[in-house]
Amino acid sequence: GLALGLKPTKTIYDLAVSGGTLDADKIDGFLSQHPSGARALMAPLRPDQAAAIGTPFLREVFEILRSRFDFVLVDTPPAFTAEVIAAVDVSTHLCVVGMLDALSLKDTKIGLETLEQMGYDPNAITFVLNRADSDVGIAASDVEQLLGRAPDLTVGSDRAIPRALTSGQPIVVAEPRSKAAGSYTSL
């Protein structure tokens, strides 16, 4: 929510502890509205709240959202927790983001290999290389050799990104003519 400038009044934790029957109308009451028209089910405010949300509940929420919206985006942490696996299991497409530093590339390689072992279709994964023009000792052209897969999209470093994050707007809204916005629009 922070990157979208949304202040959570209700979160998925509040939905989980609200009791009663879970359906699309109930979920609607817990969605935050972005000025662009996008709606967001906000993350829990504290780690203890996140721990109280079970994966069966998440799976049910994801299925209801998928039946209701054309696109459901789930921003996950970079680890294969039970919650992340629940999101992956109901996904039709994944976007894996990595950067040019050695640790990120190692984690990206492990993540892509894990998804393959889980039986996820590699053609349904978009690999985005973020800050692809950074001079960190690894060239973007080396990534395919290191990971066994070329990035589907490269996004260069752009000062417009932190400005957009600070303003709470997506880069394509805050600075639509920026290089980064052009890259993300092609996604």
Label each region the model flagged.
Residues I12-G20, L45-I53, L100-L103:
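Flexible beta-alpha connector loops of hexameric P-loop NTPases
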Residues L2, A52-S157, P162-R163:
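Conserved catalytic-core segment of NTP-binding enzymes
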Residues A139-A140, L147, K179-L187:
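P-loop NTPase motor core of the ASCE superfamily
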Residues I12, S167-Y184:
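C-terminal boundary of histidine-terminating zinc-finger modules
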Residues G1-A40:
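Phosphate-binding loop that captures ATP/GTP phosphates
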Residues P8, G20-D23, G54, S157, ...:
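Residue-level signature of the cytosolic catalytic core of signaling kinases
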Residues L41, D75, V155, Y184-L187:
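Residue-level signature of catalytic and energy-coupling elements of molecular machines
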